[in-house]
UniProtKB/Swiss-Prot annotation:
<keyword id="KW-0694">RNA-binding</keyword>
<dbReference type="GO" id="GO:0005829">
    <property type="term" value="C:cytosol"/>
</dbReference>
<feature type="binding site">
    <location>
        <position position="335"/>
    </location>
    <ligand>
        <name>Zn(2+)</name>
    </ligand>
</feature>
<dbReference type="Pfam" id="PF00587">
    <property type="entry name" value="tRNA-synt_2b"/>
</dbReference>
<feature type="binding site">
    <location>
        <position position="386"/>
    </location>
    <ligand>
        <name>Zn(2+)</name>
    </ligand>
</feature>
<dbReference type="InterPro" id="IPR012947">
    <property type="entry name" value="tRNA_SAD"/>
</dbReference>
<dbReference type="Pfam" id="PF07973">
    <property type="entry name" value="tRNA_SAD"/>
</dbReference>
<keyword id="KW-0436">Ligase</keyword>
<keyword id="KW-0862">Zinc</keyword>
<keyword id="KW-0820">tRNA-binding</keyword>
<dbReference type="Pfam" id="PF03129">
    <property type="entry name" value="HGTP_anticodon"/>
</dbReference>
<dbReference type="InterPro" id="IPR033728">
    <property type="entry name" value="ThrRS_core"/>
</dbReference>
<dbReference type="InterPro" id="IPR002320">
    <property type="entry name" value="Thr-tRNA-ligase_IIa"/>
</dbReference>
<dbReference type="InterPro" id="IPR018163">
    <property type="entry name" value="Thr/Ala-tRNA-synth_IIc_edit"/>
</dbReference>
<dbReference type="GO" id="GO:0000049">
    <property type="term" value="F:tRNA binding"/>
</dbReference>
<dbReference type="InterPro" id="IPR036621">
    <property type="entry name" value="Anticodon-bd_dom_sf"/>
</dbReference>
<dbReference type="InterPro" id="IPR047246">
    <property type="entry name" value="ThrRS_anticodon"/>
</dbReference>
């Protein structure tokens, strides 16, 4: 007789096993039409999942944003169904949900074009109008393999083989009428819920990202809960085209990515200046909050990754290498290396907290289909820190982390920040007393900082609760960047300890802290937020000195020397072009200030100034300009002079 507890605290007892759907029919029959899936003890389950034991049950409805992923997964299956109907000999490859949509790889014997895309979308809409129900059934891996083998779905067989590494038992398949696919997530109950979708583009990709493999057609699409959300997204896509960091980066000559090295960034001079300026800013804050900056190896012995738990939980995303009969893991994150530094000497409770930071070069084997400019790459730099502290220090350390994050985000002009506190999941280490204190410390730190936040119940990591801070950009997009994470597990796994006041060994708490997250990704966010118009302190070139003719070249060379001595990033444009041509070109390059020097300026020891926003200032005293410019740079101002 399972006792079912609901989110509002009420309970009901049932005589035997019962499905989540039947529970809802009992407690709120009028809500069944909008019911998407359930959560049982914090785990998402299908509507028809059976509950046999005492459980906490939550109902998730179609208006809930958490349904987006399952709508998109179901859209992928719908896309596969339409592909097989239009081109029966085609084969379905990898697919996944992206931040604002989904993709699916297919093998066909022709190259896709716009007509193919329109035909496919029309077919999908016909299927949606049938309003068919989606069913899920569990099979042994052997039986599932037979099903896909009989259908000549060679890529699905490969994906099933990969599942063997994780379960060795059974696999769930979803049935869209005659079409069958691997169930990656819960499906929507009815395909009509996928009606707010649009196929957007296509491209060619190598299977598994390897050039020696077949070229597949990758189809990208987007889907949303409501029509209004879809239309808003499509409108934003148009706006984003002018903000696309990949296009702007070409104009500004920031970086490039090569086809033979996907997900790896080649920083050019201009881009590397932006990168280094961000590091300089973070270093100012690291000094203020008393961090020690370190550097740990890019690869470490496999045993460290095994002991830390990363090999068991993160192996699919790690690059491994062998040398001299040793196996090494290239680091996907910095934390195990920081624990090695903490463990290098015996620590006293008086030494804590110890704050270790690093601009660590990390590598993650991201799927080729998920790679996107600077936003999703395989080699990135984390502005990562780990604070080793006592339990009584958690609250103050977390408060300092929050303060640091807000100070930095304010510099960039981000005003709206979404803060979430993720609490204990069902599967976790540590007792409830530790979790109670940890969650309370995080909540107290947020409240004392006068920060509004929302709970994400059951969404913490198995080793500790966390705070997530997400930025809203000018288009309303949410970027999850900063995290503050408590960790009870890693110090135990890697045998970290300090000597307490009773001269006994005690395990420290680790606070994981990142502000920008991936620096590369943060640069991508800034490019799109500023549309390439970096604040002067961050701009690769802050001032261009342009002469009207050769008579004024000596004067601008003297100005250049003065700027160089002050650390102002400037360059000379002495080309034999008209001054109007030079101005247009440098405005297109988004240079904050263009200095123009002609006869009058040379004679009076002044400058004429043109800002990239189009404002002109005549006969400005050179020292006055330098003073204003240095003040603007040193204060991290987001505005140009007189804006």
């Amino acid at each position: 007789m399972p006792t079912i507890k609901f989110i509002d605290g009420t309970c009901r007892v049932y005589p035997g096993s019962i499905s989540v759907l039947d529970i809802l029919k009992d407690v709120s029959p009028n809500s069944v039409q909008d019911f998407m899936f359930g959560c049982v003890n914090g785990i998402s389950v299908d509507r028809n999942a059976i509950v046999t034991n005492d459980s906490i049950v939550k109902f998730v409805y179609k208006t809930d944003q958490s349904t987006l992923d399952i709508i998109r997964y179901s859209c992928i299956c719908l896309l596969g169904k339409a592909v097989k109907k239009l081109w029966p000999s085609s084969k379905i490859g990898e697919s996944d949900v992206l931040e604002n949509g989904f993709f699916c790889d297919i093998e066909v014997d022709f190259s896709f074009n716009e007509t193919s895309l329109h035909l496919l979308e029309a077919c999908m809409r016909q299927m949606i109008n049938k309003k068919y129900k989606i069913y899920t059934k569990t099979f042994s891996l052997k039986k599932a393999s037979t099903i896909f083998k009989n259908r000549n779905e060679t890529y699905k067989l490969f994906l099933l083989d990969r599942l063997v590494n994780f379960s060795n038992q059974v696999v769930s398949l979803c049935f869209h009428e005659e079409y069958i696919d691997i169930q990656k997530k819960i499906s929507v109950p009815n395909i009509f819920l996928c009606r707010n979708f649009r196929l957007q583009k296509f491209s060619g990709v190598y299977w598994k990202g390897k050039r020696e493999n077949k070229v597949l057609q990758r189809i990208y699409g987007t889907s949303w809960i409501t029509r209004i959300q879809l239309e808003k997204h499509l409108d934003n896509v148009k706006k984003l085209d002018s903000r696309d960091h990949r296009k702007i980066s070409k104009i500004l000559d920031l970086y490039h990515i090569q086809e033979d090295l996907p997900g790896m960034i080649f920083w050019h001079r201009n881009g590397w200046i932006v990168f280094q300026e961000l590091k300089k800013l973070i270093r100012v804050k690291l000094r203020k909050y008393n961090y020690q900056e370190v550097k740990t190896p890019v690869m470490m012995n496999k045993k460290i990754w095994k002991d830390s738990g990363h090999l068991d939980n993160y192996k699919e995303s790690m690059f491994m290498v062998c040398s001299s009969n040793f196996e090494y893991g290239i680091k996907p994150m910095n934390c195990p290396g920081h624990v090695q530094i903490f463990n290098h000497v015996v620590r006293s409770y008086r030494d804590l907290p110890i704050r270790i930071s690093e601009f660590g070069s990390c590598h993650r084997n991201e799927p080729s289909g998920a790679l996107h400019g600077l936003m999703r790459i395989r080699n990135f730099t984390q502005d990562d820190a780990h604070i080793f502290c006592r339990e009584d220090q958690i609250c103050s350390e977390v408060s300092n982390c929050i303060r640091m994050v807000y100070e930095i985000y304010k510099i960039f002009g981000f005003k709206k920040i979404l803060v979430r506190l993720s609490t204990r999941p069902k599967n976790r280490i540590g007792n409830d007393n530790i979790w109670d204190k940890a969650e309370n410390d995080l909540a107290t730190s947020l409240r004392e900082s006068k920060i509004e936040f929302e709970y994400q119940h059951g969404e913490g990591a198995f080793y500790g609760p966390k705070i997530e801070l997400s930025l809203f950009d000018s288009l309303g997009r949410v970027w999850q960047c900063a995290t503050i994470q408590l960790d009870f597990c890693l110090p135990i796994n890697l045998k970290a300890f300090y000597i307490d006041h009773n001269n006994e060994r005690k395990v420290p708490i680790i606070v994981h802290r990142a502000v920008l997250g991936s620096i590369e990704r943060f640069i991508g966010i800034l490019i799109e937020e500023y549309i390439g118009n970096f604040p002067t302190w961050l701009a690769p070139i802050q001032v261009v000195l342009a002469n009207v003719n050769s008579n004024h070249l000596q004067y601008i060379k003297l100005l250049y020397k003065e700027f160089y001595a002050l650390g102002i990033r400037s360059e000379i444009d002495s080309r034999n072009e008209t001054i109007s041509y030079k101005i247009r070109e440098h405005i297109a390059r988004k240079i904050p200030y263009i200095i123009i020097c002609g006869d009058k300026e040379v004679k009076n020891n002044t400058i004429t100034l043109r800002t990239r926003s189009g404002k002109n200032f005549y006969c400005i005293d050179v020292q006055f300009f330098i003073s204003k410019l240095c003040k603007e740079i040193n204060s991290y101002s987001c505005s140009l002079m007189e804006e």
